[in-house]
Amino acid sequence: MTDVPAPAFDGKAFAAQLSTAPGVYRMYAADDTLLYVGKARALRNRVGSYFNGSPKNARIMSMISQIVRMDVTVTRSEAEALLLENQLIKSLSPRYNVSLRDDKTYPHVLLTREDWPRIALHRGPRAIPGRYFGPYPGVTAVRETLNLMHKLFKLRSCEDSVFRNRSRPCLQYQIGRCSAPCVELVAPAEYAESVRRAALFLEGKSDELTRELGEQMQAASEALEFEQAARLRDLISSLRSMQTRQYVDGRAADLDVLAVAMQGSQACVLLLAFRDGRNLGTRPFFPRTNGEESPEEVLAAFVSQYYIEFEPPREILLDREIPDADLLVAALSASAERKVQLKWNVRGERAGYVELASRNAQLTLATELNSRNAQHARSDALREMLGLAEPVKRVECFDISHTLGEATVASCVVFDAAGPVRAQYRRFNISGIEPGDDYAAMRQAIDRRFRRAVEEQGVLPDVLLIDGGAGQLAQAQAALADLGVEGVLLVGVAKGVERRAGHEALVMPDGRELRPGAANPALQFIQQVRDEAHRFAITGHRGRRQKARMTSKLEDIPGIGPRRRASLLKHFGGLVGLKAAGEAEIAKVEGINDALAARIYANLHGLATPDAAE
């Protein structure tokens, strides 16, 4: 029995039965791959335009030829359709859409929601309760902002585990950057007021804050509270001094400047951000394009996708007019619940900002293209050295990091011909092995990564680099063999006798060793991938180790709750001091009797507890 081919998609018939309401349409290929997401003022007219026989460019014709089905979602307005369209593009990355890809997470300033809030740099999901201010163009801008926060408002930055267990103020208090809420040297109401002022500042309301502080200073003077008035005076002076040093243009206020540069199918959108008149710096983005979009289309796609995720400022300057600008303004204003303006062809100081962004976009794109060309050359050299017939599309590398067997973490980094693919990096917390057994750790990590790929028919690398010699390579080979994974070339990266860069030996599955030499571009590519795997593993290990060392297991001991735990840690200055104490010393802590002291000592030293002995 032969398979009956699926009938060709009848686009005209599909469009004819659609309504003229606004909405979003989606196009799918035979393997159910999403080809394209689009919005429409009138669905019937827009969808029908693809199938009316009029001339279209090669990209559109190629897309239409692959369609096997379509579906639509009706919306209440075209602005709502625009928002939905870009949410789908952002989450699904259709093949033929311009898509904003950025592997990096956006840094924010986090002001936590707790009795004594802390202020900190934050990346990643917003899992911690609190207020998030940003995004900022880069980490440097966040750190500069945090530096100001500590100088002006003296908010704590320490982790809760440190905060709860301090018995005296830290260095930050001594240098005037924290008010020491850990030991309550500041009243709760006074600290809460500092938090409120910091939030005003981060919202870009420093002028309002300065006026408010002036009124409070006047009131304190009239009430003869001269010390309070002096503190407020100093704070106002610091605020004004900061404004004088950092404000570029008071009229800039909250403002983003966007410029686009294109060369062939490569595009760079550069964001220059101002908040409360301060220049926060630039950040480049490299959207995925199909090579036939205009710079105006790329910029319009960026605006809609970026500001769906992040709150737009009141004013956005563009280096050119973009399609559907009025619709974008309506959608962004509705989303932000306030007026948002898109402007181009501006004059004066703002024209200078646009020119600056445009020049930086062009320079950044040129630098990126040079980097990608060099990366492609290295990737081609790797293919030639390994004797592969096809281009190397995906390389993965595993590394193991621990401290004497403690907090073992494995990393897996991913590179393609253009460089690192950070969104696909993975870390594995290793458990259930003998501490310090790197072979077992490597085997567990390989098994976990590729077992999931087998079960979910995931993507496999062309080349799998293992940081280690023949022993580590054998573990990876065994793990892949157990899972039935084939078609992946394994290469061990062994340090030379002198353990110097450029002297590495590449261990092949058949036991051969290749020594390309430091000048070989293929080895340079391997070193780049290996070093990134090492960096990613060691940062994960340090984080896990720090968390383990800061988190006491005292509460797992019967009879120890949060209050007794706090008393013990405060009395001994931390877990290290407690572990060094004998049973008699532990029993001197308030609330700890001899039996409980014996149980604590036994648990901390891995001995049989008195209860277990009985």
From Swiss-Prot:
Record's signal peptide: none
Entry-linked SMART domains: GIYc, HhH1
Principal subcellular localization: cytoplasm
Gene3D superfamilies per UniProt: 5' to 3' exonuclease, C-terminal subdomain, GIY-YIG endonuclease, UVR domain, UvrC, RNAse H endonuclease domain
All copies of domain GIY-YIG, residue ranges: 20-98
GO biological process, one term: nucleotide-excision repair
Keywords per UniProt: Cytoplasm, DNA damage, DNA excision, DNA repair, Excision nuclease, SOS response
Pfam family, any one: HHH_5
Protein family membership: Belongs to the UvrC family.
Name of the protein described by the UniProt record: UvrABC system protein C
Annotated source species: Stenotrophomonas maltophilia (strain K279a)
